[in-house]
Amino acid sequence: MKRKLSSLLLIFIIALAISSCAGREKLLFLNWGEYIDESLITAFENKYNCDVVMDLGDSNEIFYSKVRAGTTVYDVICPSDYMVEKMYRNNMLLKIDFDKYGLTAYKNQELIAPVKAIYEEMHKQTSDVDKENETISDYSTPYLCGTWGIMYSTEVSGLENTIKNEKNSWSILFDRSKTPAGTKIAMYDSSIHAYYAACKYFEDEGLDFNTYEELPSSKLSQIKDLVKGVKFDAWGNDNIKKDIVAGNLDIGFMWTGDFLYYYCENATETVLNAYTNNDAKIDELINVLNEITKDDGEYNINGKSYSIGFDLFIPNDTIAFCDNLVISNQSSNQELAHKFIDFMISNSITVNDVEYTPAYSNTYYVDYNTPYLSVYNKIIDLKYSNPETKELLTLTQEDEDLFKEEIKSTSISNTTLYSTIYDYATSIAFGKYYDKDIVKGNILSAFPRTYINSINTTFNNARA
């Protein structure tokens, strides 16, 4: 989940951390909020006797501004594809050379098809940059990836059928005549992402709104009028998915990974509600989970209906992205930066006799997709009791006995049964909403600052 943190607080944290790093190597890492399993930071610090100072940003544009300003010289940064293009084009990145330091994690990873497609597009967009037979791939390492989708309530009569009609894929955000009366619609509070969605709406209407080209002021005015006419019920970030879960909103545009976190959590809680209400026995819980995670899924018994209450639709031409680990060309600790990237994309690494699985752990922790096939397969394998034979997990009396014992001293969410069902739900969700083979969506365009300002002005005026 990509979250915000006060700039003043961040400055204080960085200053405090740097002052405490005397005598040890330090690495400055610019990242999104809650976008890493922080136990891995500690493990890396222990392995290399160093300190990692993590600063946070909530947009690619902020990343660019921070790095460009040079007030803080970051070693490793985590920008998305289109911002990597911009940094690469402006000579802000260091070529990544794992061979120089004997690091092999990236060589051992195979990319999934959607990330291969994203990198092909990044190569295409930067093919005019002369780097002496080098490409953007030499300056960037995939970290996490995903798409944007439209989260919606399944409790509003008629809404799901409307959304799943591909002809309505973008109009349900911008044309209230396509949704049931009273539908509450939210737009993500990011002008560049809202701009993309609006352009796709106009393209569906047969107009030329190419998302890779700067539009004339007349078309920006059309976008402004469109947004003003919709009168979104909310502009938000994390609050959108929370409000849809709570029933305060019905539709919202967001990162698929942000949706997935709540989906897995609610699916698990729904299954355990059926169990604790005596509407499902221990050996029926996996079946309950399978039923409620189907399209239009419900589990009906004893006159009761159990469902998750919300779902996600991902348009074929949605936003796709890959967030990447890159090294600033101003990095003061280039070797440590290489080791950090190698560590975070490793399948397995041992620190003080403890085995860590960084690439898997980061994916599991944040619920965004992995660029790496081996990690994706490991997530899918969570539903198997034996991944080699593909024998599906079953729950038995032994699981029930353990649950009854654990619940005496802890909450349901801290039990082994909860974790087991959550893992199974995660496997289902990744298979349903992320696909390792099918390419869906387009990356954003690396527009110049002047045009980004025009987009921001357009949306500020529309919301005024």
Which residue stretches match the model-derived regions?
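Hinge/lid segment of periplasmic solute-binding proteins
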Residues: 60-64, 81, 85-145, 161-172, ...
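Mature extracytoplasmic/periplasmic domains
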Residues: 323-438
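Extracytoplasmic/periplasmic substrate-recognition and gating elements
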Residues: 270-364
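Ligand-binding pocket segment of bilobal, Venus flytrap-like solute-binding proteins
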Residues: 186-309
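Early extracytoplasmic/lumenal segment of secretory-pathway proteins
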Residues: 22-90, 242
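C-terminal motif of bacterial Sec signal peptides marking the signal peptidase cleavage site
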Residues: 17-20
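Alpha-to-beta junction loops
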Residues: 69-77, 92-94, 181-184, 246-254
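Short loop->beta-strand "edge-of-pocket" segments that line small-molecule binding or catalytic clefts
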Residues: 171-191
